[in-house]
C-alpha cells in the first residue's frame, strides 16, 4: 500500500510540473490569451507574410438606418475598405486594392511606431458600444492566418478613455486611411 501511495504522489508531482511548465510556455508564446504587447509587436513584421491588420470604426449608437461603420483591412497581398450600414454590417460600398510584402512591412513598422499592439488596462467594465454610446468607437485587430491574435477597442468621451487599446488612435486611423487613395470617394456620405 505504501508503494502505491508513493507512486500516486510521484505521478501527481509530475502532472503538476507538466502543467506549470505548459502554462509558462503558453504565457511566453502568448497562447493563453494574455499576450504581452511586446510579444505581439515582435510578431507584426516577423509574420508579415501570413498576417493582416484591421481597423473597424463605427458611429455612436443611433437608428439602424443611420448607423454606419468603416472597416479597413491590410495584408501583404491586399488592401480592402468596406462601408457598412446598420448593426448587421450590410456592405454598401467596398474597394479592394493589391498590395505587396515590402509595402505591408513598411505599414506594419509604422503601426509599431504608433503603438498598434499596446494594451492598456480598462477597468470600467463597459463593452465596445456601451462606454460612450454617442461617440465614435474603434476596434483594432491582428489576424495570423485564420486566427485573431489581437482584438482591442477604444472610445473617448467626457474626458475619459475607454477600452483596452493603448496605441495612438488618430495616427493609426490616419495610417489606415492613407492606404486608400480613394478613401474620400468611398466614404462620401458617411457621417461620423
State each model region's role.
Residues 11-62, 124-192:
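Short, well-ordered, aromatic-rich surface patches in folded extracellular/luminal domains
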Residues 90-122:
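Long, charged/polar, surface-exposed segments that mediate recognition or autoinhibition
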Residues 43-102:
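Extracytoplasmic/periplasmic/luminal assembly and interaction segments
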Residues 2-10:
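Hydrophobic H-region at the start of alpha-helical membrane spans
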Residues 82-83, 109-112, 125, 169-171:
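Short, surface-exposed, polar/charged, turn-prone segments marking secondary-structure boundaries
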Residues 85-87, 111, 144-146:
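A mature extracytoplasmic/lumenal domain signature
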Residues 77, 95, 119-121, 162-165:
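Short, surface-exposed linear patches
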Amino acid at each position: 500500500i505504501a508503494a502505491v501511495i508513493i507512486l500516486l504522489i510521484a505521478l501527481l508531482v509530475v502532472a503538476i510540473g507538466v502543467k506549470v511548465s505548459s502554462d509558462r510556455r503558453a504565457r511566453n508564446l502568448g497562447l493563453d490569451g494574455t499576450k504581452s504587447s511586446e510579444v505581439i509587436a515582435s510578431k507584426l513584421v516577423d509574420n508579415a507574410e501570413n498576417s493582416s491588420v484591421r481597423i473597424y470604426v463605427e458611429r455612436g449608437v443611433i437608428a439602424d438606418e443611420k448607423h454606419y461603420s468603416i472597416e479597413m483591412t491590410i495584408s501583404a497581398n491586399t488592401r480592402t475598405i468596406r462601408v457598412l450600414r446598420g448593426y448587421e454590417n450590410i456592405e454598401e460600398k467596398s474597394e479592394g486594392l493589391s498590395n505587396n510584402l515590402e509595402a505591408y512591412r513598411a505599414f506594419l513598422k509604422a503601426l509599431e511606431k504608433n503603438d498598434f499592439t499596446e494594451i492598456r488596462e480598462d477597468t470600467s467594465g463597459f463593452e465596445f458600444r456601451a462606454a460612450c454610446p454617442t461617440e465614435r468607437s474603434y476596434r483594432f485587430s491582428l489576424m495570423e492566418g485564420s486566427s485573431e491574435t489581437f482584438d482591442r477597442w477604444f472610445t473617448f468621451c467626457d474626458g475619459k478613455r475607454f477600452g483596452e487599446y493603448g496605441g495612438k488612435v488618430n495616427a493609426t486611423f490616419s495610417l489606415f486611411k492613407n492606404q486608400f487613395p480613394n478613401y474620400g470617394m468611398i466614404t462620401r456620405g458617411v457621417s461620423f
